[in-house]
Structures are given as structure tokens and as C-alpha cells.
């Protein structure tokens, strides 16, 4: 590779040698190709992205380095400035803008998408774009943005895509090659640090696999299986010897023999085995915090005096800007004590300053045990020697579900620090009550190939309005057809298309045999098929009428009514013992003349005649007693004789039962039957043989049409969604003009500048003046209603203006809610996915914050509101920053100068205190 001068210069500055996959990817990049790199977490994919930065700087061009998360952008900005200096590296996120005109800019993917739609001057001279963590393309919320960027990037820009290992890397690479041109796909499934799988049973740590086995795929460790069998047997014996414990089974009492380890004990075992630092995945924020508290109540200490001094220095640096009044509210002192002992939690509910301090200390090896939610696995650079999984199930917001192989791979991929550890370790804690933590289940997860990448691309209002603005409908359709979603859909119908081709060929052969597609025998067969179809439909309607008539009678029956059961094995006379409880599916309790008692339905009583009479019943009828049934059946027969009830064998006169049988005399059906009788093929020689072939032709024709419908549904779904959205936007005057040449209106240009999940609702609020005349805190509050989502299953509760602190804000919330309801009704009519409804769960909180800046009062008010789960400091900051992002858009896009000025003042009122500290 002597021609690769820049690669030689780049590698000369590295303190390590490149792996083969890194060498191949970098070489392809220097030769002018785009590159897709799929490799495990920690394998060193980012080296390829950093080489793209090197190439851009060496050639005097520009490189944009995109990430899906602001935290990742901040981290990459720090890494690149350490190497190239602050003057050459910029940062653009929703919160920060640093050196935005630098030759290398780190940004979130959304920022680049917005630049592309605005045709920003910053795109001039752009030579390389790095898309880190590109597997986020499968994310429901962020994924579409990635596809928009990939599709809109100029053709001369070299794209470097970095992805975790996915099982369909070749498919994804094939799509990238299709839409971006010459792209080299580099897939490497080799972990640079070997991963050893373990199961912790009680206080004993076992290898999951028998690594000494000579077979190709290591079997489950037999010693582990024997020990678990011994534990289960000991539990059973413990139950057998202790009757009290047997009685407690089912009440949640644990067997005495096996005791689950407390978290401090697990960490102590890992420490003794030399397996720290470790990340323990807990899958709930509360569980992470509780785990640290458990450890703090124990004697566990993992740091030396020297390490504690270094930890204190980092804490003071990270948290020095926090107000003293806020520290106690934030749980600072307990958090600090945990860090000094080498323990920490890590989750999205933490204050960003706290979370970043944990990341820095863990990466430095000063914090030894972190209890984290799975969000830590999403790209944050915090590798550990060991990863511990307490459970192999997690709550997905609705129910507890097992981890998928892809999730297991992503979590355990954190184990093993390249350049530090010789090997990484994954430890699953065994629980006797959970099948998912059994060795076979764990082995299945550990052995499975990783998750497939699935597109989540679907047109949004903002995307649609921008496409209409920049290109014709035909070009927009063509662009949508180039999406990864459409690429996958097209590949999925390959088999269907082949089926259509085979059907078409067979239909042609049969048609030739019968005399062409208009052959008389085919016309005759179609007549027969149409008649049969109409007869089936009439039969269905007739059965429905009979059932409804029977249900009407059954629902009207009263205690003591005598009826005639016309169908089933219980046919004959019966008396009603108890009326039906449910009129939609009436099932009265009856006793028959043959002494059977039970509930009947329309299937037993297919008649519409009124009861034939009635009889007096005792106040209480114990129908389960044989003697009572015998006496009552005798009384029933006597009453029937007295009332001259006809025998069931006489049948029921269909002309008198009240059904609407006019459908049986359908003129169209009569006409078709007449045509069939007169048809020239009716008495043709060899009719039966020809008819069999003709009917086969029709069966294949129907199947072929079914295949074609499936293909059409799969291959045109995005274009149809786009056209429906265009139709709604035309109706609302965001777009005008003929369908073949639509033009974006002033309101449409406003919508094109709003980037939010509720983009169209925000645009409607701006153009209708729903948010006019508000004060800064009120504007921040109403903006939060179109962004905030209550956590858990609580959902938005009550009227959206229920918590409005001022009449002006209440009116704005009501106006917003009405606009949302109208929009959702229009979406339903146009068959578009419904927009989310406004949620008032953050209204009072951010109003209080914008007015007072008092964190203690704000969090106390949030807890007192009872609006879903308690609001953590981290969530509070995160939602405030989302509000800031939309307020910043209003400051630039709102049509009214007063509203723009109010948005600017609202930004200042919200961006203070903990919200302004350590934005990330």
C-alpha cells in the first residue's frame, strides 16, 4: 500500500498498529471510496472516522462528524480537540455552537439534516461526513433523520458509516452502495478483547461454556449444570423437610437453601476474582440508585486514599458551578460519598454534570462499580473489565420481556477494555425462579448472531414540505423509493414477484389451450364463479338475520317463559329459569322437558317466534338437584299440554318466523342464472374437462391478483404516505397549486423551519396566534405541552389545561388542544398516523422554573402534582433543554416579532442554574 501516503502519515502518529479491518477501511477511504464499517463495540471503528478527519484537513476540505446523541457529540469534540486543537474543531448541537465554521465540526445528525434542507453555506467545501453509530437508523424517533441525510448528501461527499455488528450488514451495505455510489463494506465480527461468559450461582462463579471441549461449538459447562441441579434438589429437600415452607409455596416464600446474593456481596466476589471495574445492568433508574444505597450501607470500599483524593478533584471540577442551595436537592452528598468509595449509578435521570463525572471517573479506573440502565450501552465510551446482568428480562414500558440476542450482545460488548484488559467477562446472575437465567437460555443469547437492522423511515410533515419545496412530486417519489425502508421492502417482495411471473406463465399456457383469455369457456366459468360468490354472500346474510332474530328473542325472554328449542341435542320444550345477562350475546338459563339445565345461545335456538306460553316457578329453583329438575320437567310438560303447544317435530314455518328473505330473490342473481342457462358452452361437448381447466385458470388468476396487491402494498407505501400528507397540507393551505406542480405557501415555509415530532401542530399554533400575547414563562410552559411525554403508563391525565397557572396560559393550552384535536381528525380522515396529543405534565414545572429558578420548589411541585413517575433532576434538565431547542426555533422562525422576542426572553429564563451547567 505504498500509494497510501496519508494513511502512512496518519498511522505514524498512532500509539498502536491498525487492525486488518481498520487498514482495509482506511485504504478504501484514501482511494476515494465511501466506507461502511460494521464491527463489535470497542473494536476501534472510530479510528476510520478519525482518518476521514485527517484526510479532510490534509486536503484543505471539511469534515462533519455526526453522532445520534448530544453526549456523544460532546465526547467526540473533546477527543478531537485534544488531538487537533480547538481552533480546527467545532461543535454544533441543539444546546451549543462552538466554532461552527471550523474545517471539522462535530454535530448531531439532526443539525446536518437541517443544514441540507436549508442549503446552508456551511456545506461549501464539504468533502467527508462521518456517521457514527449509524445503526441508529433503526431507531423509531431518530432513524428517519439518518436516511434523510444519506439521501440528501451531495454525491461528491465521501461518507463514512460506522455501525455495531448487525446480522444484515451486507443488505445495509448494498443499499448504501445503491444510493451513495462506490462504497466499500468492511465487516469484522472479531472482538479485539476476547469475551468470557460466566454464570454466578450463589457465591460460585462458573464458566458458561466448556471451553476445553474439542467440538466446534463449545457446549454448556457440565459442572455448571450439575451445580444448578444440586441447588434445585436441595431446595426441594428443604421444602419437604419443612412443612411450613411447603405451605408457603405460591405465597412468594423463597426456599431456605438458596439465598440470592445482595449487591455488595456480588461486587465483593468480583473484586476478589480480579474482575473489577464492572458495570452491572439493572434496567431501572430506581434499581440503580437503590443498588448504590445498598452498597453504601455495607462495609464495601473499593478505593485507596490516593484514589479518593483524585475523585474529589474531579467532582469539584465537574460540579463547581452548581449553586450550594441546589446540592442537597440533587442528592449531591450521597452521590459524592458513593464516588469516593468507588461506587456510582449511571442513568438518564441523573443530572448531566453528575453523569459526566461518573463517566470520567470510571474511564480513569477510579470508580470500580457502576450500576447502569441499558442507555449506557448506546455508544457512551465506558468500557469495563466485566459486565454483570442481574436479570435477562426488562420492562419495555408495557410488560416484562426477555432480552433479545442483539440487546445481550450490545450490553456484554462493554466488557473488555482494549489496550488494558487481556480479556473481558460477562456474568449472568442465576435465579432459581427464572428460566431466562438458566444456562441453556444464556447460551442461546450468547451464541446467537446479532440483531438485524430494520429501517424506521416514514415521511414526516417537515420532510414532506421540504421535499415539495426543493423538488417535483416525481423526484420526491423517486427519492422515497431510494430509502432503506423501500430497499428492504423491495427485497422482501422478490419471492412474490417470482410467484407473479410463474402465475403469468401458467395463465398464458392455459389460456392458449382454451382459446385465449376471452374464450367462451372462461366466460362460462366466470359466470358460475360469480353466481357461487353471490349465493355464499346471501347465505351469510341469511344466517346473520336468523342469528340476530334468535338473539332478539333470547334477550327478551323472562323467567317462566316456555320456549321451543329448535336445534341441537337439547331440542324440545324448555322453561326459562333466569333471563340473559348480556343483551349483545344473550344466554338465558333454561330447563328442558328432558331434565337438562344450562344456558342456551342462538346456536340452540334458531327461531324468531315468541314464547309459546309461561308458567309459574318457585321463588328459588335449585336446578342442580336431580329431584328439582325432575319435578320441574314434569310441570313443564303439563303446562305445555294445557297450552296446546305443537310438537317440535311439526317444525317451524320459515314463512312465519319473520326473517327478511327478500335477499333470496335478488334480480341480479336471477339474471346471472338465466345467462348461465342460455350460454353456448352449457351443452358443449367435453364441458367437464374444459370447465376444470377454466376453473383452474380462475384460481390461479385470483392468487396472482393477491400477490400483485401484496407487492403494491409493500413497494408503494412510502409514496402513498407522502401523497396523503401532501393532500392534508394542501387542504390546510401549507401547499397550493395543482398536484403535478405544488407550491409551498408562506405558512409552508414556516413549517419547513420547525423540526419537532409535533411540527405541524407547532406551525398551526404559530400561524393562528394561539401563542400570541404570552409572557416568557407562559410561552415556555405551552411549548412544553407539545414536547413532554409523561413517563410510565399514566399518560396525559385530564384536560390539557388542568395545571395552567394563569388564565392566559390556560387559554393558550385550550387553543393548542383544540388545534390538536382538529389535526388528529384530519389525519384519521386522510389515513395518516395520528400525531401525539399535548401533555400538560411539565407545564407547571417549567413555568415555576422560568419564574423563580428555585430547583427545590420546582422538584417539590413536580412530586406533589402526582403526574406519572417522580421527576428526577436529570429528566428535568433534559426536558428543559428540549423546550429550549424549540424556543430557539421559535426565536428564528415565528412570524410575529413580539413572539420572537418573547421566545428569546423565555430562553434566558429557562437556561440558568442546573439547566445551564455542563450542557450535554
Swiss-Prot record:
InterPro entries: DEAD/DEAH_box_helicase_dom (IPR011545), Helicase_ATP-bd (IPR014001), Helicase_C-like (IPR001650), P-loop_NTPase (IPR027417), RNA-DNA_Helicase (IPR050699), Ski2/MTR4_C (IPR012961). The keyword DNA repair does not apply. It is an enzyme of class 3 (hydrolase). SMART domains: DEXDc, DSHCT, HELICc. A motif (DEVH box) lies at residues 132-135. It comes from the Bacteria. PROSITE patterns: HELICASE_ATP_BIND_1, HELICASE_CTER. GO terms for cellular component: Ski complex. Pfam families: DEAD, DSHCT, Helicase_C. ATP binds at residues 39-46. Residues 265-469 form the Helicase C-terminal domain. Disulfide bonds: none annotated. Residues 26-184 form the Helicase ATP-binding domain. Its EC number is 3.6.4.-. One of its GO terms (molecular function) is helicase activity. Keywords: ATP-binding, Helicase, Hydrolase, Nucleotide-binding. One of its GO terms (biological process) is nuclear-transcribed mRNA catabolic process, 3'-5' exonucleolytic nonsense-mediated decay. This is Probable helicase HelY. The lineage of its organism: Bacteria, Bacillati, Actinomycetota, Actinomycetes, Mycobacteriales.
Amino acid at each position: 500500500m505504498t500509494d497510501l501516503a496519508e494513511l502512512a502519515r496518519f498511522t505514524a502518529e498512532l500509539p498502536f498498529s491498525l487492525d486488518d479491518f481498520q487498514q482495509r477501511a482506511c485504504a478504501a477511504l484514501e482511494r476515494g471510496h465511501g466506507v461502511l464499517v460494521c464491527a463489535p463495540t470497542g473494536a476501534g471503528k472510530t479510528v476510520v472516522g478519525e482518518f476521514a478527519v485527517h484526510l479532510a484537513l490534509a486536503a484543505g476540505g471539511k469534515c462533519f462528524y455526526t453522532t445520534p446523541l448530544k453526549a456523544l457529540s460532546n465526547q467526540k469534540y473533546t477527543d478531537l480537540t485534544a488531538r487537533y486543537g480547538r481552533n480546527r474543531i467545532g461543535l454544533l448541537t441543539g444546546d451549543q455552537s462552538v466554532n461552527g465554521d471550523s474545517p471539522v465540526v462535530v454535530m448531531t445528525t439532526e443539525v446536518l439534516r437541517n443544514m441540507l434542507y436549508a442549503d446552508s453555506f456551511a456545506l461549501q467545501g464539504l468533502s467527508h461526513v462521518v456517521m457514527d453509530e449509524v445503526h441508529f437508523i433503526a431507531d423509531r424517533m431518530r432513524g428517519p433523520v439518518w436516511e434523510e441525510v444519506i439521501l440528501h448528501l451531495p454525491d461528491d461527499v465521501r461518507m463514512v458509516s460506522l455501525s455495531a455488528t448487525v446480522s444484515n450488514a451486507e443488505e445495509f451495505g448494498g443499499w448504501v452502495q445503491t444510493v451513495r455510489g462506490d462504497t466499500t463494506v468492511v465487516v469484522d465480527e472479531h472482538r479485539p478483547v476476547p469475551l468470557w461468559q460466566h454464570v454466578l450461582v450463589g457465591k460460585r462463579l462458573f464458566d458458561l461454556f466448556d471451553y476445553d471441549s474439542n467440538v466446534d461449538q463449545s457446549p454448556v459447562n457440565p459442572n455448571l449444570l450439575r451445580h444448578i441441579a444440586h441447588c434445585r434438589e436441595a431446595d426441594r429437600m428443604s421444602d419437604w423437610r419443612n412443612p411450613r415452607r411447603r405451605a408457603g409455596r405460591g405465597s412468594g416464600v423463597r426456599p431456605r437453601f438458596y439465598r440470592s446474593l445482595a449487591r455488595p456481596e456480588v461486587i465483593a466476589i468480583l473484586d476478589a476474582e480480579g474482575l473489577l471495574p464492572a458495570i452491572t445492568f439493572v434496567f431501572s433508574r430506581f434499581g440503580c440508585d437503590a443498588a448504590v444505597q445498598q452498597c453504601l450501607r455495607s462495609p464495601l470500599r473499593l478505593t485507596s486514599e490516593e484514589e479518593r483524593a483524585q475523585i474529589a478533584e474531579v467532582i469539584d471540577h465537574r460540579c463547581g458551578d452548581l449553586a450550594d442551595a441546589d446540592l442537597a436537592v440533587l442528592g449531591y452528598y450521597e452521590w459524592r460519598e458513593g464516588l469516593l468509595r468507588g461506587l456510582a449509578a449511571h442513568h438518564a435521570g441523573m443530572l448531566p454534570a453528575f453523569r459526566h463525572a461518573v463517566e470520567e471517573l470510571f474511564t480513569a479506573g477510579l470508580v470500580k462499580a457502576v450500576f447502569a440502565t441499558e442507555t449506557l450501552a448506546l455508544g457512551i465510551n465506558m468500557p469495563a473489565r466485566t459486565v454483570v446482568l442481574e436479570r435477562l428480562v426488562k420492562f419495555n414500558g408495557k410488560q416484562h420481556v426477555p432480552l433479545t440476542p442483539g440487546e445481550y450482545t450490545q450490553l456484554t460488548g462493554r466488557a473488555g477494555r482494549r489496550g488494558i484488559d487481556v480479556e473481558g467477562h460477562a456474568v449472568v446472575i442465576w435465579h432459581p425462579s427464572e428460566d431466562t437465567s438458566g444456562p441453556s437460555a444464556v447460551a442461546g443469547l450468547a451464541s446467537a448472531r446479532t440483531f438485524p437492522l430494520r429501517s424506521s423511515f416514514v415521511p414526516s410533515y417537515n420532510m414532506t414540505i421540504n421535499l415539495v419545496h426543493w423538488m417535483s412530486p416525481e423526484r420526491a417519489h423517486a427519492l422515497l423509493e431510494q430509502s432503506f425502508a423501500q430497499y428492504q421492502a423491495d427485497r422482501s417482495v422478490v419471492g412474490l414477484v417470482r410467484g407473479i411471473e410463474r402465475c403469468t406463465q401458467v395463465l398464458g399456457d392455459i389460456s392458449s389451450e382454451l382459446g385465449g383469455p376471452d374464450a367462451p369457456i372462461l366466460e362460462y366459468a366466470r359466470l358460475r364463479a360469480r353466481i357461487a360468490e353471490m349465493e355464499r354472500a346471501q347465505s351469510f346474510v341469511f344466517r346473520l338475520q336468523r342469528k340476530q332474530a334468535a338473539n332478539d328473542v333470547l334477550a327478551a325472554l323472562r323467567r317462566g317463559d316456555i320456549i321451543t328449542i329448535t336445534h341441537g341435542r337439547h331440542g324440545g320444550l324448555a322453561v326459562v329459569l333466569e333471563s340473559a345477562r348480556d343483551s349483545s350475546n344473550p344466554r338465558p338459563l333454561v330447563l328442558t322437558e328432558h331434565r337438562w339445565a344450562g344456558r342456551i345461545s342462538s346456536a340452540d335456538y334458531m327461531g324468531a317466534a315468541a314464547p309459546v306460553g309461561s308458567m309459574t316457578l318457585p321463588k328459588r329453583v335449585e336446578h342442580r338437584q336431580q329431584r328439582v329438575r325432575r319435578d320441574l320437567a314434569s310441570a313443564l310438560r303439563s303446562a305445555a299440554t294445557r297450552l296446546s303447544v305443537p310438537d317440535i317435530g311439526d317444525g317451524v314455518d320459515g314463512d312465519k318466523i319473520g326473517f327478511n328473505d327478500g335477499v333470496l330473490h335478488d334480480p341480479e342473481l336471477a339474471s346471472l342464472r338465466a345467462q348461465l342457462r342460455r350460454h353456448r358452452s352449457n351443452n358443449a361437448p367435453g364441458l367437464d374437462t374444459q370447465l376444470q381447466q377454466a376453473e383452474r385458470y380462475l384460481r390461479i388468476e385470483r392468487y396472482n391478483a393477491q400477490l400483485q396487491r401484496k407487492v403494491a402494498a409493500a413497494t408503494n407505501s412510502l409514496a402513498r404516505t407522502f401523497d396523503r400528507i401532501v393532500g392534508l397540507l394542501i387542504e390546510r393551505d401549507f401547499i397550493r397549486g395543482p398536484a403535478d406542480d405544488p407550491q409551498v405557501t408562506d405558512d409552508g415555509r414556516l413549517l419547513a423551519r420547525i423540526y419537532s415530532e409535533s411540527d405541524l401542530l407547532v406551525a398551526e399554533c404559530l400561524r393562528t396566534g394561539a401563542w400570541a400575547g404570552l409572557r416568557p414563562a407562559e410561552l415556555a410552559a405551552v411549548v412544553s405541552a407539545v414536547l413532554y411525554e409523561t413517563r410510565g403508563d399514566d399518560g396525559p391525565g385530564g384536560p390539557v389545561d388542568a395545571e395552567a397557572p394563569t388564565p392566559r396560559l390556560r387559554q393558550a393550552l385550550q387553543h393548542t388542544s383544540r388545534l390538536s384535536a382538529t389535526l388528529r381528525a384530519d389525519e384519521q380522515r386522510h389515513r395518516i398516523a395520528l400525531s401525539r396529543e399535548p401533555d400538560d405534565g411539565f407545564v407547571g414545572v417549567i413555568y415555576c422554573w422560568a419564574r423563580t429558578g428555585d430547583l427545590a420548589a420546582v422538584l417539590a411541585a413536580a412530586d406533589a402534582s402526582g403526574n406519572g413517575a417522580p421527576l428526577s433532576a436529570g429528566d428535568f434538565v433534559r426536558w428543559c433543554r428540549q423546550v429550549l431547542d424549540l424556543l430557539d426555533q421559535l426565536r428564528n422562525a415565528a412570524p410575529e416579532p413580539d413572539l420572537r422576542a418573547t421566545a428569546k426572553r423565555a430562553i434566558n429564563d429557562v437556561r440558568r442554574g442546573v439547566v445551564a451547567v455542563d450542557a450535554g
